[in-house]
Amino acid sequence: MIIQISNRQEDFQIDDELTSDIEKSIRICLLQELNDDNYEISLSFVSESEIRKLNSDYRDKDSVTDVLSFPLDDDFAIQTNLLGDIIICCKRAIEQAKEYNHSIKREIVYLVVHSMFHLLGYDHIDESDRIIMRNKEKSALKEIGIYKDEEFK
């Protein structure tokens, strides 16, 4: 498993402990879904201005969001084992962590898991798809050791 991490923001320090938790969460998602972790993912931590621009350019939404997922074309991903890109806005993740009363590390791990399932082909546009994706997230988070309203160990 290869995870290319790029930190292009100054709102939160991406330390070794968080990096390890991120690697663990990505591996769990891959093993649960594909029974294989021989994939490459790009993960970028960005500022509000950068994620707003990406959201505007690729989704026609001129707003800050917490996370964006850019899966690669299925045929290309299968041939190369490249799944795609995850872009996280740390400032927005900090705000959400406060809102939900848990740590920023917990929020970032959740956002990584959520985004991984987008890279793996899931979505939450309609209710039935949302339920399927949410159950996948819950299963992965449980294996990681994150439960609703709790910190992970």
From Swiss-Prot:
Gene3D superfamilies: Metalloproteases ('zincins'), catalytic domain. Binds 1 zinc ion. It comes from the Bacteria. Its main location: cytoplasm. Keywords: Cytoplasm, Endonuclease, Hydrolase, Metal-binding, Nuclease, Ribosome biogenesis, rRNA processing, Zinc. Its cofactor is Zn(2+). The lineage of its organism: Bacteria, Bacillati, Bacillota, Tissierellia, Tissierellales. One of its GO terms (cellular component) is cytoplasm. Zn(2+) binds at H114, H118, H124. It is found in: Cytoplasm. This is Endoribonuclease YbeY. One of its GO terms (molecular function) is metalloendopeptidase activity. InterPro entries: MetalPrtase_cat_dom_sf_prd, YbeY. Belongs to the endoribonuclease YbeY family. Its EC number is 3.1.-.-. Single strand-specific metallo-endoribonuclease involved in late-stage 70S ribosome quality control and in maturation of the 3' terminus of the 16S rRNA. Signal peptide: none annotated.
